[in-house]
Curated annotation (Swiss-Prot):
<keyword id="KW-0472">Membrane</keyword>
<protein>
    <recommendedName>
        <fullName>Photosystem I assembly protein Ycf3</fullName>
    </recommendedName>
</protein>
<keyword id="KW-0602">Photosynthesis</keyword>
<dbReference type="InterPro" id="IPR019734">
    <property type="entry name" value="TPR_rpt"/>
</dbReference>
<feature type="repeat" description="TPR 3">
    <location>
        <begin position="120"/>
        <end position="153"/>
    </location>
</feature>
<keyword id="KW-0802">TPR repeat</keyword>
<keyword id="KW-0793">Thylakoid</keyword>
<dbReference type="GO" id="GO:0015979">
    <property type="term" value="P:photosynthesis"/>
</dbReference>
<feature type="repeat" description="TPR 1">
    <location>
        <begin position="35"/>
        <end position="68"/>
    </location>
</feature>
<dbReference type="InterPro" id="IPR022818">
    <property type="entry name" value="PSI_Ycf3_assembly"/>
</dbReference>
<dbReference type="Pfam" id="PF00515">
    <property type="entry name" value="TPR_1"/>
</dbReference>
<keyword id="KW-0150">Chloroplast</keyword>
<dbReference type="InterPro" id="IPR011990">
    <property type="entry name" value="TPR-like_helical_dom_sf"/>
</dbReference>
<feature type="repeat" description="TPR 2">
    <location>
        <begin position="72"/>
        <end position="105"/>
    </location>
</feature>
<comment type="similarity">
    <text>Belongs to the Ycf3 family.</text>
</comment>
<keyword id="KW-0677">Repeat</keyword>
<keyword id="KW-0934">Plastid</keyword>
């Protein structure tokens, strides 16, 4: 039984029912319906912290999904899982792949910036001030692009950019 059919959460059940109705009335292929079911099950597993199960569902959704825009969200969610697991290098790979398919994905840009900022902080702790500045500049570039796409979001990033004098071009 698919995960989406065994949800105990009211909101998840409601989403599942609505999604199932939409899948029945929208003119989509069986392959697209299967891809969406795996994606939905991946999101459900991810929300419950079942990352291995979520990844299995996302990989299956990727195998079936042909639309680049839809694939971008699957890749983004895979990146989120790797970020949560502390696998920042792998997360970056998936965020970059998501952006290749959907350049207007500010959340992926933000998450890339967060990783570069984190690495910059680590470089400071390791006494690598030159490397930290390079990483902070990369973070600033990605945050600026995320803010350009979503000007009312990422307030903390906007404040950091102002405080560090990196807010030029906003």
């Amino acid at each position: 039984m698919p995960r989406s059919q065994r949800n105990d959460n009211f909101i998840d059940k409601t989403f599942t029912v609505i999604a199932d109705i939409l899948l029945k009335v929208l003119p989509t292929s069986q392959r697209e319906k299967q891809a969406f079911t795996y994606y939905r099950d991946g999101m459900s597993a991810q929300a419950e912290g079942e990352y291995a199960e979520a990844l299995q569902n996302y990989y299956e959704a990727m195998r079936l999904e042909v639309d680049a825009y839809d694939r971008s969200y699957i890749l983004y969610n895979i990146g989120l899982i790797h970020t949560s697991n502390g696998e920042h290098g792998r997360a970056l790979e998936y965020y970059y792949q998501a952006l290749e398919r959907n350049p207007s994905l500010p959340s992926a840009l933000n998450n890339i910036a967060v990783i570069y900022h984190y690495r910059g902080e680590q470089a400071i702790e390791n006494g690598q001030s030159e490397i930290s500045q390079i990483l902070f500049e990369k973070a600033a570039d990605y945050w600026k692009e995320a803010i350009r796409l979503a000007p009312t979001n990422y307030i903390e990033a906007q404040n950091w950019l102002k405080m560090t004098g990196r807010n030029t071009g906003l």
